[in-house]
Amino acid sequence: MDVILIAAVTQDGFIARHSQETIKWSKDLSLFKKQTMGWPVIMGSNTFNCINSELKNREIIVMGRDDSPQKTLEKIDKEKCFIAGGGKTNARFASYLTHLYITPHPNVFGSGVSLFTGAVKEMNLVFEAILPVDKTNGIFQFQYRVN
């Protein structure tokens, strides 16, 4: 199964200013919706509380602190699923990731929630594709395979 981390990030690597932020700065919501439609989306409870209204027609799996990433993935009977944050959840699933879909935005926060919060082993990524999100503002999604 493909396990795909999907995230909008700032130029300094943050996915939010703080864990309770309702994300208004991201310009890739329509692409996120298109890519995740019909697939399981795994996220932490803070992320779920911040974007729940945007997630119709998807199987949402909200991870608790004690939930096992491996057991969660074993229960999924689909060819792919998405990991959609936050930073702690991304880090917990890092060793299972097969792909990263990252959309850098023209923002710098200086501090906030990192893409991976916690220790993550080094990943070698292989470029697969680039998709336009907002060409006028230079926003593109970069798709990588974890090697």
Task: State what each model feature region is.
Residues M1-N147:
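Enzymes that bind and transform nitrogen-containing heteroaromatic metabolites
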